[in-house]
């Protein structure tokens, strides 16, 4: 009984326009950022190295290489109000559910094959 009530409340806050993406895909996430008194959308593009959770608590981690070869990882809640958009740039072909091994790779070794 209580589980049904929780699911009903969660369903109210879940987004409907979330694209289907998987680990290994390159995604572009638009995040709403507040700077002083103005608000803008900041794009963060990278490879999805982890997906976890389900329902309202579903989240994913995106990794990209920033300037000077420094790796940056950000974790986003799929249904968070700050996440403006999720756009799949390219589909990756991987055989793992977690791509933490990419943290130790640089350059061409960190490339992921494209799914056809």
Curated annotation (Swiss-Prot):
Give GO terms for biological process.
Answer: translation
InterPro entries for the chain? Ribosomal_bL19, Ribosomal_bL19_CS, Ribosomal_bL19_sf, Translation_prot_SH3-like_sf
- Please indicate which superkingdom the organism of origin belongs to: Bacteria
Q: Tell me, what is one Gene Ontology molecular-function annotation carried by this entry?
A: structural constituent of ribosome
A Pfam family of the record is Ribosomal_L19
**Listed transmembrane segments:** none
Record's keyword terms, sorted: Ribonucleoprotein, Ribosomal protein
Which PROSITE patterns did the record assign? RIBOSOMAL_L19
GO cellular component terms, A-Z: cytosolic large ribosomal subunit
UniProt cross-references to HAMAP family, sorted A to Z: Ribosomal_bL19
Explain the purpose of this protein.
Answer: This protein is located at the 30S-50S ribosomal subunit interface and may play a role in the structure and function of the aminoacyl-tRNA binding site.
In the record, the note on similarity to other proteins reads: Belongs to the bacterial ribosomal protein bL19 family.
- Please give the name of this protein: Large ribosomal subunit protein bL19
Gene name? rplS
